[in-house]
Amino acid sequence: MQIIKRLINKTVLLLTLIVMLSSVFSFQSVKAVSNSKTTEMIIHYKEKLGNTKDWNLWLWGENANGTSYEFTGEDEFGKYAKIKIDGDYNRVGFIVRTNEWEKDGGDRWIENIKDGRAEVWILSGDEKVYNSKPSSDLSIQKATIDSFHEITVTTNVPFNIKEKKIEIEGIKIKNITPYDINSGNITNKVKIITEQKIDLKQTYKVKIENLADTNTEIGQVIRSEEFDNLFYYGGNDLGNTYTPQHTKFRLWAPTASEAKLVTYKKWSDKIGAEINMQQGEKGTWTSELKGNQKGLFYTYKVKIGDKWTEAVDPYVRAASVNGDKGAVVNLEETNPKKWKANKKPKFKNPEDAIIYELHVRDLSIQSESGIKQKGKYLGVTEKGTKGPEGVKTGLDHIKDLGVTHVQFLPIFDYASVNEETLNEPQYNWGYDPKNFNVPEGSYSTNPYEPTVRITELKQMVQTLHDNNLRVVMDVVYNHMYNAAESNFHKLVPGYYYRYNEDGTFANGTGVGNDTASERKMMRKFMIDSVTYWAKEYNLDGFRFDLMGIHDYETMNEIRKAVNQIDPSIILHGEGWDLNTPLAAELKANQKNAEKMKGIAHFNDNIRDGLKGSVFEEKENGFINGKENMEDRIKKGITAGIDYDTNSSTYQDPEQVLTYVEAHDNHTLWDKLELTNPGDNDEVRKQMHKLSSSILLTSQGIPFLHAGQEFMRTKYGDHNSYKSPDSINQMDWLRRATFNNEVDYMKGLIELRKKYSAFRMTSAAQIKTQVSFIGAPKNTVAYTIEGNKNEYFTVAHNANREAVEITLPSKGPWKVLVDGKQAGSKPLYVVHDNKIKVPALSSFVLKLK
């Protein structure tokens, strides 16, 4: 919206008076200008006693981006912020949070905006937004059911529990005690134990003498083991089950007292037909529609307490534009021609994989790509495309490079791109899950038709398979885009996420919420989802974003489930040690790798060892000038199998992804520009090639970021998740310029694929067949005894001058890599037991 720039003289005078009187706090002070193009608010916030956190506000107009605002003043109620935003909004959302995204409550909404102005009051730990200043007189804030025999009542101020009669309508009280036994009888938090078992579908009135009644709400009981055991549903029919004769629906919503199926003839319909669902087993609700329901749109409505909410089916497999409604489809009709469910390239050991990480849009969006379907699934399928100077682009480029697996950044339905306005450039990595089992619509040629995205994604997978490339999907089960507005939370509030002790969403992910994989139905959802993608889309692997949020038992169950489909499916993830309320020994992180066989972890130790920490942009590593890094590089070369307990517990090379760059953080080229600004491009090219040489001759599973082969740059952008195409696109002009460097990477890949010595399949092999030999400072050299009497010497020189390496014998030695060229065929032969390794270069020699 346009901002009015010219103000009348009286307005200027009024603004001047406001500034002069700013110490006087009332709504008069923000009544600045009657301007329908702005919205002005005062937000009052009362912190908990003893608070030490630095809270601020994250605020957004409805359907607009958010911005951070500080509290600017303080009065007798607490802190306050005066905020003015562009736009005439009827609703404004806000979160009380820290800069680290720890939250005090979830999303709150200001809805009393009149003439562009509003004033509200909020209390820490209380989700309610008050339109007038809350009274300091005693009142009940909330009453939560925390077990099947326990209700916790919280009041706004402490009171003497011996002086007030407390009752719960419809249930007998066994005893009443302070929540904190050390607080005495004067407290603002009371624990009530009931005689009878509490019915979670029922709402109870809590009464404290002379106070207004309060209804109970579901609390910690929903996260209890007893709840899980009572309501776990193990069936395979959640979501909709379609046949031409009828479609059945099953929803898991055990705390709902009523549930309805809402059907829509068109995706754009605002009002649907409501059909009462029947209670089923284990907290499920069912409905059946006769006849062929193909093309029907639907949602669910549930009544929890006295409130109805509507949400998309979490198990939905097709959806409307922007994923706001589920859709019934015949999945068999979405298969492309010649689709074969189990047809895929041959693949034996995880260590044989060379993974290439790619964003669908990045591959084709540049005008020079020569690809017609720019930014689409179908763009990945185009063959014979050419770029500047006739270089191969798109699919042909990837195939020519020689990698084995293409790993796609999120291709499930995510929330951060508006599928109705695709004529406007929009970009996002996609780590904003909305519908986990639905393909992203912005990559399809028609997001309005639910089947198109399904068919086109299958065409992409089919084409990659036909070109001897396997497909890995990046999955993001660790959080949802907006927890409070998610289908998980609307349908079963309090269950699918982890919570802090104060009832706020846990935030180990750093994006506002953590899902709770340790709970049975969240675990089941993850297993069901992964196996659905593996079977329906014939996928070959899964990368788990922030895997350390999950528990290792869930990951093992997923490994077990995909083994039954195809044991060659690879699983890997980010096993970071994240601050989420889950016991350390249960986390699916690097420290617990020994408990997770068949699941690989990104090895940040070799990543940072090679180039310097990703959290210290100017810190160097082995390749760019840091000394005494040899031992760290050796551990990376041997797949980290001998790490101590503080850095790794890898038991097998299949558990390690060796990498130096990914979509996160600076590209290696951009990092080198930061750490070595005094070096020219030719020197940085040698550093970059040295890194590639180490990665592709190390044990474990090598992982490459798309464009790494032509030294990709994002122009210094270390977090390009929503940056424009000009930053994120694959630059085919650069590909043409860096042709020699691409050939070098191709040669390294060819070498690795030809000789199994570089991809051993056990720790025992590595320990007995890889031996480090003497080498000068800032140099690592070793020998490998391969199969078929193959014997190699490898040397990596990070010095600025050539070094001499003594070889185990006089050979003759075939030189396969010399820092300038690489491949599986000899460049030349050396008849000597000494070799000069040039500055910032690698040598690979094979005994003839």
How would you name each of these model-derived features?
Residues 253, 294-296, 828-848:
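C-terminal beta-strand-rich structural cap/linker in extracellular carbohydrate-active enzymes
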Residues 53-63, 152, 156-179, 257-272:
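Short, surface-exposed alpha-helix to beta-strand junction/turn motifs within ectodomains of secreted
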Residues 6-29:
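Sec-dependent N-terminal signal peptides of Gram-positive bacterial secreted proteins and lipoproteins
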Residues 39-41, 76, 272-279, 424-425, ...:
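Active-site-proximal helices and loops of the catalytic beta/alpha 8
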Residues 49-53, 89, 154-162, 252-258, ...:
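Short proline/glycine-enriched turn/loop motifs at strand-loop junctions of beta-rich domains
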Residues 30-49, 73-147, 189, 195-248, ...:
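The feature marks proteins involved in alpha-glucan
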Residues 651-812:
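Loop/helix patches that line or flank the sugar-binding groove of alpha-linked glycan CAZymes
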Residues 361-537, 555-566, 570:
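Substrate-binding/active-site clefts of carbohydrate-active enzymes
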